[in-house]
């Protein structure tokens, strides 16, 4: 499993808005892969333009269920051993991103359910990021939020 970049670095708020409206949902959540991919992309961008002030926007159901490396556990969401390991990997990567100090972040949780499986707040806290739930924002609200950064 791997992460997919839906929006490469851009200054175009309009492009971001269009992509947000067509955001696919469902399936597995390889969150640690997503954080690593976003971090690498952002660092690469900073090497090209050290004066820029990028904002890493993580839009996810924030229910990580795919480990960094495959293990023998079948369903990571409900496995007593595998699931805590997945969460530990995600939070460790989030803390690493925060420790770098160069990258501002936002975490937007798109799953409307909020229970013990919801890790958006924990991920945002570990990243030093602002946290939002999608039902509290609409596309226009997200765009306003990004413009205010």
PLM feature spans:
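Short beta-strand-loop
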Residues: 1-22, 42-47, 68-71, 116-123, ...
